[in-house]
A protein has these predicted regions:
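Feature of multi-pass inner-membrane transport and sensor proteins
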Residues: 166-167, 182, 219-227, 231, ...
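Polytopic alpha-helical membrane proteins, predominantly small-molecule transporters/carriers
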Residues: 59, 177-178
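Glycine-rich helix-loop "coupling/hinge" segments at transmembrane-helix boundaries
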Residues: 212-238, 324-328, 493-520
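Membrane-water interface segments at the C-terminal ends of transmembrane alpha-helices
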Residues: 2-35, 51-163, 191-212, 216, ...
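The alpha-helix within a helix-turn-helix
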Residues: 173-174, 455
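Short, charged juxtamembrane terminal tails flanking transmembrane helices
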Residues: 175, 544-551
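Short alpha-helical segment that forms part of, or immediately flanks, the ligand-binding pocket
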Residues: 170, 452-453
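A short amphipathic helical element positioned immediately N-terminal to and/or at the very start
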Residues: 41-51, 184, 330-340
Length: 551
């Protein structure tokens, strides 16, 4: 009975967080007057959208940018991942940490940092006399800025696949007369292709849902992506709910197609490289090529991490931008202002930390239950639970925001969370639910199949077995996922912009508004503290994951 109750509660929560927002997007897209309680004029909003002269440029710009980011991420992440996974490099953990930082840095902060560094009269021109303003504010510039944030997904997919599979099959090919290049081309690369395809398509998905970079750089580059178009339809008067819903469906269709293609490519190609007890993968020696390889990795790290970080810190320490880079212009007043009780910074920080903590606790519990019900209990309808719990991984944040607005801004609700902080909590929980589901699911796969049945034989109920057997074993992975959720939720931008109540700011909204108001130094000071906090949480999560793996 308790198991059925938990199954019902889990399914109800998933319906509330995921299914209903998507349903209301679909209803608003079909019925233009649905928000007013009318179902007439079905599909009346489709033709005006198709006739919109901006639609081809928005869709084309989205696909062009996302395709460019995916290709550029492969061009950078593939060789770096091969160097990390196949060869013995000094301080390998340091390179992993270095390439983790760009993924941790909020893309909109990176975009603003690059803008301050490369634009006319930016830091590069002040220090060297050069400026790359035309490159930055172009399609290629947007692709480069987004790539430096996203390429780590390819790097980690490739390097982890190589580290897990080892090089024994390639060594067998070498023993039988194959050259090093032939062994790589015919053995290693085909084994690597599922991970490479997954990383590339994940990079594509992350690019199409990005809002901050195209919003910061796109207007001056003449590029409008679907995410920016959706936000404008909700922010500009008169509000176009039907247009926002239709664009959300279009963006969701592109994201789901990429997700489906990734699933097909990875799911249909199964490669077995380790049977029995795995051996230790020490990696081959690069010999005299070690130094050039390290220089290449350091150069990429310097561009992806060093330039935005230096730009961010310079801005936070400069009294005024017009004062330029000089010792006389150095000040700590922007950091001091963050702790001024009269300002909004502490309030924004408190709101973000509270929402992030609430999101981590809720999705941690819900993700644990969903993974346990699907993988261990194998309940009826587990396919629905599994699909709903993982679907947000393919949903852009702006789509989730639109769905929640359409769901809760309806007159028939007796009480609604609309225009309250509960809306932000719902959006964060929806977006970040896949993290604990995947982490706990991976941990559950590593458990022996006889642990819970043994507890059941000795009289333990399913819930007691979950509490006393399963939870202690998967807790490190669950805690790592919750820390990741906390770190990401504390700097989420697009849903915060769409759903924040009037007069309330999160850290992301505070930073964005500071730039809009010209208080760049204070915005970058807050960004620096946010990045440092996220880095500490990420390192803690990695340590817990390694502990779980060793256990």
């Amino acid at each position: 009975m308790k198991q059925k109750f938990l199954s019902g509660v889990t399914l109800a929560a998933l319906t509330l967080l995921v299914a209903l927002p998507l349903l209301f997007i679909l209803l608003q897209a079909i019925f233009p007057h649905f928000s007013a309680g009318s179902l007439h004029d079905a599909f009346g909003g489709v033709w005006p959208l198709l006739a919109d002269p901006q639609l081809p440029s928005m869709l084309g710009g989205t696909l062009w940018i996302a395709g460019g980011v995916a290709m550029a991420s492969v061009m950078i992440g593939l060789p770096l991942g091969i160097l990390r996974g196949m060869f013995s490099l000094p301080l390998p953990w340091l390179w992993d940490l270095l390439f983790l930082i760009p993924f941790l840095t909020p893309p909109y902060i990176s975009a603003l940092s690059w803008m301050l560094a490369l634009q006319s009269q930016g830091y590069l021109q002040q220090l060297t006399g050069w400026q790359l303003n035309d490159l930055l504010f172009s399609r290629s510039g947007i692709v480069l800025v987004m790539t430096f944030n996203i390429f780590p997904v390819v790097y980690f997919a490739v390097s982890r696949s190589l580290l897990a599979s080892g090089q024994r099959l390639a060594m067998v090919a070498r023993v039988h007369g194959a050259s090093a290049w032939r062994a790589f081309w015919h053995v290693t690369l085909p084994m690597l292709s599922p991970a490479l395809a997954a990383g590339m398509l994940l990079a594509f998905t992350l690019a199409i849902e990005e809002f901050g970079v195209p919003a910061a750089l796109g207007s001056r580059a003449g590029v409008v992506m679907l995410t920016v178009g959706i936000e404008k339809k909700l922010a500009d008067w008169p509000v176009d709910l039907t247009g926002a819903a239709l664009l959300s469906l279009l963006l969701m269709a592109v994201a789901l197609f990429a997700w489906w293609l990734q699933t097909r490519l990875v799911g249909e190609k199964e490669v077995t490289s380790v049977t029995g007890k795995p051996g230790e993968n020490r990696g081959a020696s690069l010999g005299w090529m070690t130094l050039p390889a390290l220089l290449v990795m350091a150069a990429v790290g310097g561009l992806a991490v060093g330039v935005p970080a230096v730009s961010m810190m310079l801005t936070s320490l400069m009294g005024t931008l017009s004062g330029g880079v000089s010792l006389e212009n150095v000040t700590l007043r922007h950091f001091a202002a963050l702790f001024d009780q009269q300002g909004d910074a502490l309030s924004a920080l408190g709101v973000s930390l509270s929402l992030a903590l609430g999101s981590a606790l809720i999705v941690g519990a819900l993700g644990l239950l969903a993974a346990w019900l699907v993988m261990v209990q194998k309940i009826k309808g587990r396919g629905v639970v599994d699909a709903l719990s993982l679907m947000p991984a393919a949903l852009p944040g702006v789509v989730v925001g639109v769905g929640l607005i359409l769901l809760w801004n309806q007159p028939f609700w007796p009480r609604s969370p609309y225009n309250t902080l509960w809306m932000l909590l719902l959006s964060y929980c929806c977006l970040l639910l896949p993290w604990p589901v995947r982490y706990v699911g991976s941990a559950l796969r590593q458990l022996g199949p006889n642990l819970e049945p043994a507890a059941r034989v000795h009289g333990a109920s399913p819930l007691r077995a979950l509490r006393l057997i399963v939870l202690p074993l998967v807790f490190p992975a669950l805690l790592a996922a919750m820390l990741m959720v906390f770190a990401v939720a504390s700097r989420e931008l697009v849903t915060s912009l769409l759903l924040s109540p009037a007069g309330t700011q999160t850290v992301a909204v505070f930073i964005w508004r500071q730039f809009e108001q010209g208080s760049v130094g204070q915005g970058m000071a807050m960004a620096s503290l946010t990045l440092l906090t996220g880095l500490v949480l990420m390192l803690t999560a990695l340590a817990l994951m390694q502990r779980s793996t060793r256990g």
